[in-house]
């Protein structure tokens, strides 16, 4: 059966490898699919992650780095459950995350391991442990709750599924276990069914199970069913069963009958078993899926088998329900995600036709609303109706698939049934059944409502509408409107009867709802009429309605102007204003007229409203001049100002300041140009200067930047308004830096008497012209001098101020200024007063009044300049007596004492406050010795040096310098550029230093001589101090200095100094001597001070005499000395001597260097002695390691074994590696064996050719690297047995397999390699790489085993790699097989066709070519078969029929000249009605003269050149062929050609049929004439009947009468009269029935009460009885008897002839 006609369709939705899932992770433990929404894959390499695949977007997987043992996505939402084992325990940690919210919902640590888990509901996880089953809700904080313990039959089972029933009352756990010993290949299935209510379990044998709900007829509540499938082996027989059982039967209700059916497995699938079961709740079908990919489909209700097929070539390990489509998803080992769904178009025909199960077909069609059972349903309905089973017929009609029986005919059929007294009318049963099943259609709703309305049962209608049981229509609304307007409105709305809805809203005065509803449905009512209607009764409602219209999309349907006029016509000014203000808010240019209108009407009637509108500024497009005039008339002057645009108008209005708010007027000035604003201001000042000054000032303040400050100032000056100027500039002053502005403000303030403001500005402002302001204030002669004081004090006009105040006798202000304002300027005031010859008493009083606030220095300077210093004596003495320490006070006082020569030395030496430089400078010309005293007191070095040099006072200078002990001063006086240096040195050496008793002074002097680089002078100085028995003879530092200076300046004296001096720093001086290369002197110093190490270092490092050093070492016998000697010997390469010296020194500190040098010189015997000594002192890994290495180098292996057994800290691993690297394999073997480094030991044994031991060591090491090294060594040594042992441990690692294979192959060991790989197949850890590599080896070296290997292990091969190998080795048959296994059907087909002798096999090729994706390969296959296998080409074409372009196939065969060859194929595909196929077959039929098949082809398939074919065969020698030509002309509507051709062959029946079908009166009447002419009277009579509808009675009678054929026309005449009289009778009958209906209505009203009792049995609500039609029988006329044939004429069928009544 073709796949397209199969009842179940399969589709590959996705392949997991295509979205990056590695093949190794496509397993039961790594992949989960809890619903049709998500697939979850757990990856462990290259890093741990979880991949979530949303089935709505499968090509956009979500990958998250998560480490877990299992991951489950929630069936409904993005909630992920994770399970991971707690390290070091058997416990599992469970977590639940919300991926979208990125939050953890819950977590729990299970005390035992969870072996299986599953989402059993969207809110509940089922957890299965080794012994129990738990449920864990994701809601709240609850922990897992134990549900039941596992039964014994599930012990040691692998749990593969766990499910719960829809009501969560039943649970089922399924596991599988190894098969019985008699048949181990067949896996056992075990099931545990648990009842939550009864808390009981039942153990059963089953591989798969699923729950379902099913409604048993007669039971309102659904029953819970369980379906399970099992396959068991008993007594040598395999039994496969499907069971369907009800769980928890409901007492007193009909129960489900237990069903069971056989599962038929093909022989090739004897060991296959069910792995999953899904129940389609949409179609009530059971899907049983087996491991090897078989699908069984059964009906849930009857357990009837429907379909079986293999849906996957690879094992299926996971399924999930696809609830939305009534199918399921399945995932196989290859990673295909397959979707199985019901083929809705074919399943019913398949069940009814192929299975011949009509009842199941009907039930499934009703259940799933599926097509294909229409005829069966209609036939069944008619049978039930004929059997008067009206209830069953009603139920069948209600459940009919796709509503095929829900028609007016069915309603009429039930209406026509007579009602027996006391019984429920069938029509009521029908409607009741429909209501219980769902919703009525429009016709049914109308008919039922008509009954209800007639009986005034409005409440029934309301209930049905509320339950959505009726389909609303306009007709239904019209019917209901007669009894209830509200209900009718609801019906109109549901039926979208828009005009009726609008009319209803209008009647209810709900106009706002009209707009809302019209917008929703896109309807346009008569808005103007509605608005006028509302205006008459509700003006505010009209405003609201108009506003709602204005907000409609696309604008208001009624023009705003029209709406406004409607309001104004009724004098509704406020309403019109309200409307316009709302709609004109956008302020659009096109609304200018309306803006003007709303302002005009309000300026005339409600000026305050207009003022508010204008103030808001919401309009800008109205007629401004018109509105300006109206505003002026209404007294809205400020608005008129804003609207006028001409200066005269503005000037006229602006003077009305009494009626204009000042602030508004100020703001208006801001809208004018500066020129116009000035003009208006001038007018205002002219009209009322005093009254308008404040407004003008305010305007100037506000807009000074626009108007210009200068212009404003000129304006006020023009009107001489200093008050205005003062107020204007007062606000602007803080922003201006213009000196002129500040001056004018000072001037205006002064002239307006604002003295305090003048004082403030002169004090605070920084921008006025000081000179100009000073002059103005002096000229103004203000009574208050403070402004002038501010100016003069700030800008240093103090002398001018003093002169002004003194000359104007304002002495009080002078005292105030000096005492309070600025005492610091008192010296200037005093100087000016002295210049003005002011009395000294006033000046002294002024000075004494200020006292300590007075700055002394400038005061002294002012008095000194005028030779009036003595004036200050009293003032200065007063300050001193007050305790003043001011230097200037004491300087001045000192100068006065020096000038008066009043014991100046006492003052200079005792006064601590004067400035030595100032006073000393003052004394230099008067007395240099006083200057020296002053300078010495202040340590004024430079000044003192200068004055002593100038006056040759060198002794004073030398003493000062020595006492000073200042390095910089010494540097200066000892500088070679100092002309007086020699005189100073002489005085220092002869006088100053011998007099000194201070070591610090001596030290400073010596240091200064050293710094000045005067060594000879220094030696001279030091010899005098140190060697001539002075106080400093034994001074340690000076002795050091003397020797060091001699070393530097005169080395010949050094040895003498060493012998004569004893108190010097021997080590330091010795080092200096070494640096100065005075080695013997240094050696003497170190010996003198017993510094033997330094002494021997001088001999070794400087004298470079190892012999003298050894001799010295023997003399002193110190370890440290021997150590230095040993190090020197080591440096010189005397390794043995050095080692001996180190041993004498007992020195182990330099063992690293000794080891290095000993190894470089190969002195291992001595090194052993040294290391043994070192080991006694230090515990270093390096020492022990080097000792082992030294033993190995001198071949003392016994000592090595003894040493490593003793306690040691050697790094044995490092030593072993070093020995191995240097090929000391025996020693390395000892080390590696001791530390159990089996890997290194194995490699070492390989080097020693001890292969068996190497293998044993490698086994202990169990390292891939070690195995490889040993294996390769064994291969090289041809120890293939040992090599195979190693190789089996390597090839289980995927990454190392290829390396081993290449190593064997490069050395030609092909058989041994194959043997190794074959042995590897049986390994527990055998992987895909081994199977693949063996296949490649077979392909290269043992071709005969290749195919067997591929077939055995096709699922475990890396097929692409093996494909390349087979292609290289040209194994075409195997290559084809591999392509098929890898679903590379295009390549498989190409290979077969290119290498057909080896690769072609017909059945296989058919399977391949049916699955190829490249369309061109279909036609290549056709060419291939045409050339090589033409005898079976039709078999191939039938396989490809659904994929081929039939036209192209026909062209190929036509060009090849073998069109007849594919005749069977063309017949099979002719149903597609392809032109090329039709023409080719017709051509063949013509050639074969098979006119029957030709006519059949023409009838069934019209796509061909009809006229061309007719013209081709109209002259054929066979009559039947010519008849076909006439038939084609008839079909093509060429009636005349068809009739002419039939006439020619005397085919009169064909002529009549053609004329009848043409529908043309003329042709029919011409044919009558032809028969008359030919004398064919019988044909004439027959033609009258055949063309009855076309022949006019008068023409027929005329022809018959004229040609004496009335007898032959009489049957036609009788029929015509009967038909005519029947029409008349029908008209009379209609009139009588109309009269009866009037009487019947009257009778119905009387029968209402009696008929109401008929509603008792109606479900769910009662229905009124329909009016009973009259019982009418047939018309009394039977069908006409068939006319007997006339002689020589065939029987005449009644073409177009109506049935004749019997007479």
From Swiss-Prot:
Residues 25-67 are annotated as: WD40-like repeat 1. Residues 1227-1536 are annotated as: Involved in binding clathrin light chain. Residues 1564-1703 are annotated as: Trimerization. It is a peripheral membrane protein. The modification N-acetylalanine is found at residue 2. It comes from Arabidopsis thaliana. One of its GO terms (cellular component) is clathrin complex. Signal peptide: none annotated. Its main location: membrane. This is Clathrin heavy chain 2. GO terms for biological process: endocytosis; intracellular protein transport; vesicle-mediated transport. Residues 462-478 are annotated as: Binding site for the uncoating ATPase, involved in lattice disassembly. Residues 114-155 are annotated as: WD40-like repeat 3. It comes from the Eukaryota. Transmembrane segments: none annotated. Clathrin is the major protein of the polyhedral coat of coated pits and vesicles. Mediates endocytosis and is required for a correct polar distribution of PIN auxin transporters.
């Amino acid at each position: 059966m073709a796949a397209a006609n199969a009842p179940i369709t399969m589709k590959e939705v996705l392949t997991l490898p295509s979205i990056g899932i590695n093949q190794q992770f496509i397993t039961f433990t790594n992949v989960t699919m809890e619903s049709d929404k998500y697939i979850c894959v757990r990856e462990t390499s290259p890093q741990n992650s979880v991949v979530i695949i949303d089935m709505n977007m499968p090509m956009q997987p979500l990958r998250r780095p998560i480490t877990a043992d299992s991951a489950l996505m929630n069936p409904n939402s993005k909630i992920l459950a994770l399970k991971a084992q707690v390290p070091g325990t058997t416990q599992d940690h469970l977590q639940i995350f919300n991926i979208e919210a990125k939050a953890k919902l819950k977590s729990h640590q299970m005390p035992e391991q969870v072996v299986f888990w599953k989402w059993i509901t969207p809110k509940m996880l089922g957890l299965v442990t080794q012994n129990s089953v738990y449920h864990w809700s994701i809601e709240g904080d609850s922990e897992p709750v134990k549900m039941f313990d596992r039964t014994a039959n599930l012990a040691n089972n692998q749990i593969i599924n766990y499910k719960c029933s829809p009501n969560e009352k039943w649970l089922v756990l399924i596991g599988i276990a190894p098969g019985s010993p008699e048949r181990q290949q067949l896996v056992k299935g075990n099931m545990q069914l648990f009842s939550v209510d009864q808390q009981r379990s039942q153990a059963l044998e089953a591989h798969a199970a699923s729950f379902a709900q099913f409604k048993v007829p007669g039971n309102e509540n659904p029953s819970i069913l369980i379906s399970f499938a099992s396959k068991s082996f008993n007594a040598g027989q395999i039994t496969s069963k499907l069971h369907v059982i009800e769980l928890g039967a409901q007492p007193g209700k009909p129960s489900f009958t237990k069903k069971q059916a056989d599962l038929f497995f093909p022989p090739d699938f004897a060991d296959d078993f069910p792995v999953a079961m899904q129940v389609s709740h949409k179609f009530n079908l059971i899907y049983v899926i087996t491991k090897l990919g078989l699908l069984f489909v059964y009906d849930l209700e009857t357990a009837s088998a429907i379909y079986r097929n293999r849906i996957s070539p690879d094992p299926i390990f996971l399924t999930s329900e696809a609830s939305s489509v009534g199918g399921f998803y399945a995932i196989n080992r290859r990673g295909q995600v397959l979707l199985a769904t019901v083929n809705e178009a074919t399943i019913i025909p398949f069940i009814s036709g192929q299975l011949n199960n009509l009842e199941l077909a009907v039930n499934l069609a009703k259940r799933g609303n599926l097509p294909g059972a229409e005829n069966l349903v209609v036939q069944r309905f008619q049978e039930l109706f004929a059997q008067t089973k009206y209830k069953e017929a009603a139920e069948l009609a209600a459940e009919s698939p796709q509503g095929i029986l829900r028609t007016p005919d069915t309603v009429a059929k039930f209406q026509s049934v007579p009602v027996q007294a006391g019984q429920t009318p069938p029509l009521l049963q029908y409607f009741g059944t429909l209501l219980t099943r769902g919703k009525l259609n429009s016709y049914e709703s109308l008919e039922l409502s008509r009954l209800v309305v007639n009986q005034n049962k409005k409440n029934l209608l309301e209930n049905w509408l509320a339950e959505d049981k009726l389909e609303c229509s306009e007709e239904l609304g019209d019917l209901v409107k007669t009894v209830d307007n509200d209900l009718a409105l609801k019906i109109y709305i549901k039926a979208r009867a828009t005009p009726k809805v609008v009319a209803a809203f209008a009647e209810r005065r709900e106009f706002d709802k009209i707009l809302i509803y019209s917008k929703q449905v896109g309807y346009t009512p008569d808005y103007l009429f509605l608005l006028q209607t509302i205006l008459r009764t509700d003006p505010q409602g009209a405003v609201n309605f108009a506003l709602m219209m204005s907000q409609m999309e696309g604008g208001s349907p009624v023009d705003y102007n029209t709406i406004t006029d409607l309001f104004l016509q009724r004098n509704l000014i406020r309403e019109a204003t309200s409307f316009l203000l709302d709609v004109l808010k956008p302020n659009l240019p096109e609304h200018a007229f309306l803006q003007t209108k709303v302002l005009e009407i309000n300026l005339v009637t409600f000026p305050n409203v207009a003022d508010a509108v204008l103030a808001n500024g919401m309009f800008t497009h109205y007629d401004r001049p018109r509105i300006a005039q109206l505003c002026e008339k209404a007294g809205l002057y400020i608005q008129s100002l804003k609207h006028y645009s001409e200066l005269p108008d503005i000037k006229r209005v602006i003077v009305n300041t009494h009626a204009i708010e000042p602030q508004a007027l100020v703001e208006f000035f801001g809208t004018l140009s500066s020129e116009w604003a000035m003009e208006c201001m001038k007018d205002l000042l002219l009209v009322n200067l005093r009254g308008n000054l404040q407004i003008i000032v305010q305007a100037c303040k506000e807009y000074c930047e626009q108007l210009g400050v200068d212009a404003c100032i000129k304006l006020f000056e023009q009107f001489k308004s200093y008050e205005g100027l003062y107020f204007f500039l007062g606000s602007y002053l803080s922003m201006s830096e213009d000196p002129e502005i500040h001056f004018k403000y000072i001037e205006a303030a002064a002239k307006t008497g604002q003295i305090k403001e003048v004082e403030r500005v002169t004090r605070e402002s920084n921008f006025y012209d000081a000179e100009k302001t000073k002059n103005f204030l002096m000229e103004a002669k203000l009574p208050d001098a403070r402004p002038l004081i501010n100016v003069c004090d700030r800008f240093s006009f103090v002398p001018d101020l003093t002169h002004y105040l003194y000359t104007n006798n304002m002495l009080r202000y002078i005292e105030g200024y000096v005492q309070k304002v600025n005492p610091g300027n008192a010296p200037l005031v005093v100087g000016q007063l002295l210049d003005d010859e002011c009395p000294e008493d006033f000046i002294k009083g002024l000075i004494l009044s200020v006292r300590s606030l007075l700055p002394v220095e400038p005061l002294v300077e002012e008095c000194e300049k005028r030779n009036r210093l003595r004036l200050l004596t009293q003032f200065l003495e007063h300050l001193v007596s007050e305790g003043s320490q001011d230097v200037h006070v004491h300087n001045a006082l000192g100068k006065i004492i020096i000038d008066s020569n009043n014991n100046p030395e006492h003052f200079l030496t005792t006064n601590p406050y004067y400035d030595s430089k100032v006073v000393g400078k003052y004394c230099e010309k008067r007395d240099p010795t006083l200057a020296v005293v002053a300078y010495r007191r202040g340590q004024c070095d430079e000044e003192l040096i200068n004055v002593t040099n100038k006056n040759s006072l060198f002794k004073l200078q030398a003493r000062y310098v020595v006492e000073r002990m200042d390095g910089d001063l010494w540097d200066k006086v000892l500088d070679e550029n100092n002309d007086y240096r020699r005189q100073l040195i002489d005085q220092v050496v002869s006088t100053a230093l011998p007099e000194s008793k201070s070591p610090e002074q001596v030290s400073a002097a010596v240091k200064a001589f050293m710094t000045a680089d005067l060594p000879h002078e220094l030696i001279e100085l030091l010899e005098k101090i140190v060697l001539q028995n002075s106080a400093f003879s034994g001074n340690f530092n000076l002795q050091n200095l003397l020797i060091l200076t001699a070393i530097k300046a005169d080395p010949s004296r050094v040895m003498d100094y060493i012998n004569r001096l004893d108190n010097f720093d021997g080590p330091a001086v010795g080092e200096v001597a070494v640096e100065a290369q005075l080695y013997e002197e240094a050696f003497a110093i170190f010996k003198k001070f017993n510094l033997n190490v330094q002494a021997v270092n001088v001999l070794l490092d400087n004298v470079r005499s190892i012999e003298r050093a050894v001799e010295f070492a023997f003399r002193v016998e110190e370890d440290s000395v021997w150590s230095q000697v040993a190090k020197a010997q080591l440096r010189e390469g005397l390794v043995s001597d050095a080692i001996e010296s180190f041993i004498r020194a007992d020195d182990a500190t330099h063992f690293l260097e000794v080891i290095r040098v000993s190894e470089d010189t190969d002195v291992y015997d001595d090194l052993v002695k040294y290391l043994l000594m070192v080991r006694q002192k230090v515990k270093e890994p390096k020492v022990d390691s080097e000792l082992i290495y030294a033993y190995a180098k001198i071949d003392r292996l016994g000592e090595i074994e003894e040493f490593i057994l003793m306690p040691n800290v050697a790094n044995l691993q490092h030593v072993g590696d070093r020995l191995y690297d240097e090929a000391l394999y025996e020693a390395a073997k000892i080390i590696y064996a001791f530390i159990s480094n089996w890997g290194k030991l194995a490699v070492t044994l390989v080097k020693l050719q001890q292969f068996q031991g190497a293998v044993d060591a490698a086994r202990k090491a169990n390292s891939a690297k070690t195995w490889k090294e040993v294996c390769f060594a064994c291969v090289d040594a041809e120890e293939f047995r040992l090599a195979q042992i190693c190789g089996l441990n390597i090839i289980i690692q995927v990454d190392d397999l290829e390396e081993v294979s290449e190593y064997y192959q490069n050395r030609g060991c092909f058989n041994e390699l194959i043997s190794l790989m074959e042995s590897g197949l049986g390994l527990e850890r055998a992987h895909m790489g081994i199977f693949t590599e063996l296949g490649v080896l077979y392909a290269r070296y043992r071709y005969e085993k290749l195919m067997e290997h591929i077939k055995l292990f096709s699922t475990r091969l890396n097929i692409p790699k093996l494909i390349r190998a087979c292609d290289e080795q040209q194994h075409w048959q195997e290559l084809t097989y591999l392509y098929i296994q890898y679903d590379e059907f295009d390549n498989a087909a190409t290979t077969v066709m290119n290498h057909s002798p080896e690769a072609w096999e017909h059945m296989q090729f058919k399977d391949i070519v049916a699955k190829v994706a490249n369309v061109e390969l279909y036609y290549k296959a056709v060419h291939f078969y045409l050339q090589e296998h033409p005898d079976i080409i039709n078999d191939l074409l039938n396989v490809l029929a659904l994929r081929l372009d039939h036209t192209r196939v026909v062209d190929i065969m036509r060009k090849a000249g073998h069109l007849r060859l594919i005749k069977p194929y063309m017949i099979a595909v002719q149903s597609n009605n392809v032109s090329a196929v039709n023409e080719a077959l017709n051509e063949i039929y013509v050639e074969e003269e098979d006119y029957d098949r030709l006519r059949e082809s023409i009838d069934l398939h019209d796509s061909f050149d009809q006229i061309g074919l007719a013209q081709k065969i109209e002259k054929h020698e066979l009559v039947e062929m010519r008849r076909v030509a006439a038939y084609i002309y008839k079909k093509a509507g060429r009636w005349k050609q068809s009739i002419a051709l039939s006439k020619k062959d005397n085919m009169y029946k064909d002529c009549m049929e053609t004329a009848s079908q043409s529908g043309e009166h003329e042709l029919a009447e011409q044919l009558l004439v032809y028969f008359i002419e030919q004398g064919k009277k019988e044909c004439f009579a027959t033609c009258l009947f055949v063309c009855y509808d076309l022949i006019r009675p008068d023409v027929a009678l005329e022809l018959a009468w004229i040609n004496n054929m009335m007898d032959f026309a009489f049957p036609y005449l009788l029929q015509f009269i009967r038909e005519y009289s029947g029409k008349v009778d029908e008209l009379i009958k209609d009139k009588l029935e109309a009269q009866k209906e009037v009487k019947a209505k009257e009778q119905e009203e009387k029968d209402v009460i009696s008929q109401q009792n008929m509603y008792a049995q109606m479900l769910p609500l009662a229905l009124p009885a329909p009016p009973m039609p009259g019982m009418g029988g047939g018309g009394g006329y039977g069908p006409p008897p068939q006319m007997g044939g006339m002689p020589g004429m065939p029987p005449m069928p009644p073409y177009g002839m109506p049935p004749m009544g019997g007479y």
